[in-house]
């Protein structure tokens, strides 16, 4: 059961992400699974200054709001990810400065593994989703499909989505994603990436991946 304490915690985390400059004004949205329901930032809300009146409580299975607050226009992919990924409890759609700049590049990076933090925390493969209208069924379908096996995606000319087990993991993924994109942009394209062997080494010794 969702309590006022849950709502207060959700709002505090929304403000934390805003303070980190992961989104501005009404850009971005956030969701948090609690049992069979989810807290979702409401449509038109400003996540950095989110208030209780703009927090929607939705049934994950049906998507129906339980408290009369309409959820974000992107709630379809939030709920879709939560349905498909029982290991995921938090989903964040954000538009940080450099990562969004990369999403608007004509020639987007095929590889974001500029530092060890990317394969270790963000994902060694980050799918790039074509542009679809925000809030559209096509965008929701593409995001949910991509995030069945990935924890981070780039949305062309739009932004980014990351998911994780809790607020801290999502914060970490979003922050390191932005860091990688800042390196890519500020390098002017003159940057190196980790080799597959170096990534595998990190996965074994940092993430504990078993060797074949």
Protein language model annotation of sequence segments:
Residues 1-212:
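Glycine-rich flexible loops
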